[in-house]
């Protein structure tokens, strides 16, 4: 939103300097992006009247002029402008003047003729282009000798504000003036809206066919206008200083009313319309050539203003070329409407162009402003272009409901931290146009039609705070006794998990929670993932239920960059559906290991990491927790190299090698190893208990069992551990044999058993019965002792 300070002062009786106003607006939430004067710095330029013009004796394109600059003597100036003539008044820079760019004026000779100054164009003064080739011609009543900066108000400050989407009420000079009045307490002078008398004549019927999209539509016919009339200089200046180019008088009047009071308008050529006006949704196959010379195919989600023949304009966005006014226009139809922001929002992106009107409509326009806008525009048309106005014709659809919001003074003090007197609060609310009514707890306000953003108590507190001035709220540094929170012994710190993974050579990664739907099918067999209603892209259409897909993608990126040994982990949330259909999210830790077990080095052979390498990492991560690894058929993993991680009878995760069928699909030279565990289970741990070191030597017994291939090592270890007593300190596999001497389908598994007594030296009498018990348990499970 751009406006000039001089225009603002016609509605807000403020004497603040431009610098102070800039600070005030910014601190109140209306950020001033730029504040600059209407013209660049220059000095020594006055209004001069050309008294005579003679051809230069020695140059065809130069003229010798004598001008009156108000000093009582005529000044001779040589001028080359093609439009110079006697009787005109123009800007004149005298010797000693300094023009933009530090261009200094001094007496000089031009082809032998003395020139004591320079007659100026708009370009030479740094002013907006007036479309004239030559001197900037001033009005006939311009006072000779007056400083041009003073006459044209070139020291006027132009403010450019960054208006947030919720403050559409500030997209007009009236809205800014109302805001300044509330902030400073100065008088707010609303633009005078005169009810213009109707002189009979024609009317244009209006029908709203989409009442939910258009709450109000008003039209008025004005006949016999002079569309060739010149836009007054005062109006043209205000438009230009608001960043809008003057086009033609009828278009300029519509733009002026929009800037002045905030209501976008449109002007139709009445003679180009057929029948009544309809506000409806576009029909399939309809097209419209717009004022920007673009022809668009209209979608059925688009609101249009149409006549009996077809669409005339994109409602709230841009008019159509077929019904546009021109210099030949004699009869016009003024339009002012209220369109629901929802129907206008997004149309600028949809059709590839926007307008000042759409910028306002999609944020919300005052739904009680339309009649005032028609009256104001009618007044200006009759004043500048003449004509006879007909009656206003109004159609009404669905308008927003009037909202009432309560404000508790106690809550206001709690939130802002300052006790603002009730009388001051009431004054602020009144200046904001919120019509406060006193209640037992504070006030009840009625949100005005121009404030769509006043909906709840917090909105009112924000308004009070910014008008009162956040910088006026005293600093009150929070103080209090801080209690050190206890960390339970059964819960390990989160940072310990990160440190553990980093210490084992894993690098932390972060991936999107939005993933490719195919990943969910491949890595989790999830045919019904949680789908996003508005995905960022097609490849990010669902929420992940596993971390494996993201880790595999990161592996691919590293392989593309010639990294042949990759170890990464991620701690993040996964998403699913509970038994009751509600969404659930759990935090998990996932890891991936690809490539060699150890970095390449001279002291040992290089081998690829296998299932047992990553299983060791998982065991180390869960070292304070009793876990078992149970063979599983997880969809992402190799059927023979995968296990569920079980704790207290509950599956808390899985570990294994990626299934071979995914290697070719995801362009992986070899299978990576992966794991995924519930983070809650990782953070839970048993208490660390002190245990004395035994003074007595341990005893080792090695047992080799012949068992079926279908029987896993874990099955054997579970049986042996179940038969052990407190003397058994460790049972583990140290060798597996297949081949000669064993029946087909059988294998030999060698197990070491470490026994130790904390109080006595173990004897054969104590050891042998226990070993026999272990052998018996294994035999009962289908594993016989190898002889």
From Swiss-Prot:
Superkingdom per UniProt: Bacteria
Name of this chain's protein: Phenylalanine--tRNA ligase beta subunit
CDD domains: PheRS_beta_core (cd00769), tRNA_bind_bactPheRS (cd02796)
GO molecular function annotation: ATP binding; magnesium ion binding; phenylalanine-tRNA ligase activity; tRNA binding
Any one annotated GO CC term: phenylalanine-tRNA ligase complex
Domain called B5: residue spans: 400-475
Subcellular location: Cytoplasm
Key words of the record: Aminoacyl-tRNA synthetase, ATP-binding, Cytoplasm, Ligase, Magnesium, Metal-binding, Nucleotide-binding, Protein biosynthesis, RNA-binding, tRNA-binding
Segments forming domain tRNA-binding: 39-149
Subunit structure: Tetramer of two alpha and two beta subunits.
E.C. designation(s): 6.1.1.20
InterPro entries given in the database record: aa-tRNA-synth_II/BPL/LPL, B3/B4_tRNA-bd, DNA-bd_dom_put_sf, Fdx_antiC-bd, Fdx_antiC-bd_sf, NA-bd_OB-fold, Phe-tRNA-ligase_IIc_bsu, Phe-tRNA-ligase_IIc_bsu_bact
UniProt cross-references to NCBIfam families, sorted A to Z: pheT_bact, YtpR
PANTHER family: PHENYLALANINE--TRNA LIGASE BETA SUBUNIT (PTHR10947:SF0), PHENYLALANYL-TRNA SYNTHETASE BETA CHAIN AND LEUCINE-RICH REPEAT-CONTAINING PROTEIN 47 (PTHR10947)
Cofactor(s), by name: Mg(2+)
Family to which this protein belongs: Belongs to the phenylalanyl-tRNA synthetase beta subunit family. Type 1 subfamily.
Note describing how the cofactor binds: Binds 2 magnesium ions per tetramer.
Domain FDX-ACB: 694-786
Record SMART domains: B3_4 (SM00873), B5 (SM00874), FDX-ACB (SM00896)
Reactions performed catalytically: tRNA(Phe) + L-phenylalanine + ATP = L-phenylalanyl-tRNA(Phe) + AMP + diphosphate + H(+)
Binding site for Mg(2+): 453, 459, 462-463
Cell inner membrane found in the keyword field: no
Name of the encoding gene: pheT
PROSITE patterns: B5 (PS51483), FDX_ACB (PS51447), TRBD (PS50886)
GO biological process: phenylalanyl-tRNA aminoacylation
């Amino acid at each position: 939103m751009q406006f000039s300070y001089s225009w603002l002062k016609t509605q807000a009786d403020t004497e603040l300097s431009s610098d102070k106003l800039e600070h005030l607006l910014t601190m109140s939430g209306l950020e001033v992006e730029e504040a600059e004067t209407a013209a660049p710095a220059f000095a020594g330029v006055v209004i001069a009247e050309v008294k005579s013009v003679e051809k230069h004796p020695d140059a065809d394109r130069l003229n010798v002029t004598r001008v009156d600059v108000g000093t009582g003597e005529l000044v001779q100036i040589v001028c080359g402008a093609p439009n110079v003539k006697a009787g005109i008044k123009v800007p004149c820079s005298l010797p000693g003047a300094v023009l933009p760019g530090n261009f200094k004026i001094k007496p000089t000779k031009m082809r032998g003729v003395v020139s004591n100054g320079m007659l100026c164009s708009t370009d030479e003064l740094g002013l907006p282009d007036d479309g004239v080739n030559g001197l900037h011609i001033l009005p006939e009543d311009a006072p000779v000798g007056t400083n041009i900066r003073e006459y044209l108000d070139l020291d006027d400050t132009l403010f450019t504000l960054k208006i947030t989407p919720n403050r559409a009420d500030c997209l007009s000079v009236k809205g800014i003036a109302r805001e300044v009045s509330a902030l400073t307490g100065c008088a707010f002078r609303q633009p005078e809206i005169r009810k213009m008398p109707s002189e009979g004549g024609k009317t244009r019927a209006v029908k709203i066919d989409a009442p939910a999209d258009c709450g109000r539509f008003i039209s008025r016919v004005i006949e016999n206008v002079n569309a060739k009339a010149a836009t007054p200089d005062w109006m043209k200046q205000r438009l230009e200083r608001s960043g809008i180019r003057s086009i033609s008088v009828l278009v300029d009047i519509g733009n002026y009313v929009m800037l002045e009071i905030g209501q976008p308008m449109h002007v139709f050529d009445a003679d180009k319309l057929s029948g009544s006006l309809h506000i409806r949704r576009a029909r399939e196959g309809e097209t419209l050539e717009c004022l920007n010379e673009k022809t668009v195919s209209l979608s059925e989600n688009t609101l249009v203003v149409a006549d009996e023949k077809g669409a005339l304009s994109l409602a709230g966005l841009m008019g159509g070329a077929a019904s546009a006014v021109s210099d030949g226009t004699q009869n016009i139809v003024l339009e002012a409407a209220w369109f629901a922001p929802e129907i206008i929002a997004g149309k600028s992106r949809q059709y590839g162009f926007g307008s000042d009107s759409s910028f306002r409509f999609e944020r919300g326009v005052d739904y009680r402003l339309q009649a005032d806008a028609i009256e104001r525009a009618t007044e200006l048309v009759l004043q500048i272009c003449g004509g006879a106005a007909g009656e206003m014709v109004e159609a009404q659809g669905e308008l927003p409901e009037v909202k009432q919001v309560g404000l508790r003074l106690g809550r206001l003090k709690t939130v802002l931290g300052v006790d603002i007197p009730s009388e001051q609060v009431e004054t602020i609310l009144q200046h904001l146009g919120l019509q406060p009514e006193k209640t037992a707890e504070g006030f009840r306000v009625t949100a005005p039609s121009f404030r769509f953003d006043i909906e709840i108590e917090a909105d009112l507190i924000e308004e009070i705070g910014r008008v009162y001035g956040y910088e006026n709220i005293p600093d009150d540094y929070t103080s209090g006794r801080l209690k050190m929170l206890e960390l339970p012994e059964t819960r390990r710190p989160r940072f310990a998990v990160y440190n553990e993974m980093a210490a084992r050579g894993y690098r932390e990664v972060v991936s999107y929670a939005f993933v490719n739907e195919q990943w969910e099918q491949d890595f989790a067999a999830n045919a019904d993932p949680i789908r996003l209603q508005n995905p960022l892209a097609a490849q990010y259409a669902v929420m992940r239920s596993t971390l494996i897909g993201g880790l595999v993608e990161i592996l691919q990126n590293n392989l593309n960059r010639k990294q042949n040994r990759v170890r990464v982990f991620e701690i993040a949330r996964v998403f699913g559906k509970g038994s009751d259909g509600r969404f659930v999210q759990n935090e998990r830790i996932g890891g991936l290991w690809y490539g060699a077990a150890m970095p390449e080095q001279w002291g040992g052979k290089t081998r690829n990491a296998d299932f047992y390498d990553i299983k060791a990492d998982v065991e180390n991560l869960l070292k304070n927790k009793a876990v078992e690894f149970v063979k599983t058929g997880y969809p992402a993993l190799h059927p023979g190299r995968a296990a569920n991680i079980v704790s207290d009878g509950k599956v808390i995760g899985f570990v294994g090698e990626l299934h071979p069928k995914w290697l070719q699909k995801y362009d992986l030279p070899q299978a990576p190893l992966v794991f995924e565990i519930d983070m809650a289970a990782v953070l839970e741990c048993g208490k660390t208990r002190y245990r004395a070191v035994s003074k007595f030597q341990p005893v080792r017994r090695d047992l080799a069992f012949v068992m079926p291939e279908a029987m896993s090592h874990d099955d054997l270890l579970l049986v042996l551990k179940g038969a052990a007593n407190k003397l058994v300190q460790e049972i583990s596999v140290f060798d597996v044999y297949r081949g000669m001497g064993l029946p087909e389908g059988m294998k030999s598994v060698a197990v070491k058993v470490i026994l130790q007594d904390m109080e006595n030296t173990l004897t054969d009498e104590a050891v042998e019965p226990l070993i026999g018990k272990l052998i018996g348990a294994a035999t009962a499970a289908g594993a016989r002792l190898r002889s």
